[in-house]
Amino acid sequence: MAEELEHQPSLPQQANLTARPPFPIHVLPPKIRAMAEAVAAFMTTGKDLSAAVAMTVLNAAICGGVRIMHRGHPERVTPSGTFNVSIGVSGSGKSVIGGLMMKPIFDFEREAQERFGRDVRPGLEAERIEVEAEIKLLSNEAAKPREEKGADAKARRNRLTDLLRRKHEIEERMHPPQFIIEDSTVQSFARLLKATGGRVLILSTDAREIIANLLGRYNNGKADDSILLKGYSGEGFKFTRKGPNGIVETINVASTAMSMHIMVQPDKATEMAERKELQEGGLLQRINFVWSDNRPGRASLSKPIPPEIREDYQQFIFELMRTYYCAEGEVMFYLSDESWQALEDYKEAAQVAAGDGSHPSWTFHTRDSEIACRLAAGLHAGDLGDKAHESDIPVETIRRAITLMDYYNIDRMMIADNMEDRSDDKVMAKLRDLATTYPDGFSPREAQRKRIAGMHKGAEAVQAILDQKVKNGVLQLVDEGPPRYKFALR
């Protein structure tokens, strides 16, 4: 089949010949790559989108239980979930491609819910009926006049306490298996995390509602990303809110495990990427964005997805979900010594690329090595299936993960550049105001009062901006007296 796909009729060429390079589909594990290529041949809209979703599905299928660690550094344990946003214009096939690639996870959830309804819920219902009947019997006994009650009221109270505890436990166990969430308030999200032991997948082929919620639809317009940040890091979560009846509800989740892949059109991705709270809170820096090259499809070139490729892919993802997502407790993927060193070297290179911290790109690059580590875990599971935990992650897999990370950084750096441009626009506006107010030049102290470095930055940050503007030829120092600045004559 792989040979057949290599000899498909050529697809229509991209209109933009300077477009970013294609997704490095060659680094994907064989069964995953085969399905991504088959979906691309079926849709004829390009391989980027199907390949990007395929990589995400790998991490989603293991994130519930898998953590990554080097034996020599037990203090550094990394979750295996990844956050991803794929962007494509209307008509690029997002819904169909996403539906085909994510189908095994949705099917796994559906089958688990059907088994629960058939094999588990009836027994829980029967147990609840028995408990409620005994509660009613003891409640009726307690309601009798004192002279008609049994002798041992304390024993009855203790028994009622035990029964009510059992009833609460049964009701908690009656929540059907749920792995996927889409449109949700923070409150319902927190309740789901409580019911699932902190594990959840955020998957959607049309994430407008998810982004609306993230940007504050239920939070007075303020972006609400706290639960996602906790889930990405695997941290515990505590949610407290007063309900409409005045009762305070507290939900405690000891730890979280989360992965996300949402698909949107460019306008929603732009709205998300330009939101200041998400930039400053760090969510954007944790996301892999893929602006896909997908183009109009050609029905005459479409090839059906071979059933054996579809079935192999489905069963493989089922295998990963059973073994790793639904694992009891943690399953550790260990990094080999060479893999650990490769990630440390990559981290150092990323820190060098971040420069002196004057450009927002550094807030993205500090995450490069960690995200590559997570990607390597997904690739490792894709290579070895349910035996992945029996072997260390080899350095070759780290190199493949770094190839993916370098691809993701193309779009991540576009976001960082946009953040820098917007920040510089604000600085320049304030400098122009200072130049108008102080035509003979303004001092660093006056620039600090104008807060050219932002609300919470001090004299050192202000001076760094002024020095950079002088270096770039935007400002010049006034010749005489204490330091004062004017716009440079050009």
Task: Name these PLM-found stretches.
Residues 1-490:
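Phosphate-handling catalytic cores of nucleic-acid transaction enzymes
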